């Protein structure tokens, strides 16, 4: 399976906009550097697995939504893991 980083960036941007958040707000919540989220959303930067996980927590979803475009069936289990 090949990851499409353009689609990942679009999914992250879509989720952020659904929640009505600015890029700077998400960067702060996910402890990302200035403009890094912008670069991810525009496919300039490729996020690590750790960054995708932090973005999922910041955007109240699972990494699955960004990586494959669907929510995990057990969102509560992911929330428990992410709080560890």
State each model region's role.
Residues 3, 10, 20-21, 47-50:
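Residue-level signal for the short linker/turn that defines the boundary of a DNA-recognition helix
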Residues 22, 33-36, 48, 62:
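Short coil turns linking two alpha-helices in DNA-binding domains
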Residues 31, 50-65:
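DNA major-groove recognition helix of helix-turn-helix/homeodomain DNA-binding modules
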Residues 10-27, 82:
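Short basic helix-loop element that most often maps to the first helix and adjoining turn
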Residues 67-84:
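Short, charged recognition helix plus adjacent turn
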Residues 1-7, 76:
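A detector for short, charged/polar N-terminal pre-domain segments
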Residues 31-46, 68:
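Recognition helix of helix-turn-helix/homeodomain-like DNA-binding domains
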């Amino acid at each position: 399976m090949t990851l499409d980083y353009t689609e990942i960036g679009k999914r992250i941007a879509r989720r952020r906009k659904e929640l009505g958040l600015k890029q700077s707000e998400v960067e702060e919540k996910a402890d990302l550097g200035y403009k890094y989220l912008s670069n991810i959303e525009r496919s300039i930067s490729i996020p690590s697995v750790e960054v995708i996980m932090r973005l999922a927590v910041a955007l109240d979803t699972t990494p699955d939504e960004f990586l494959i475009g669907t929510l995990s069936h057990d969102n509560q289990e992911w929330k428990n893991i992410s709080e560890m």
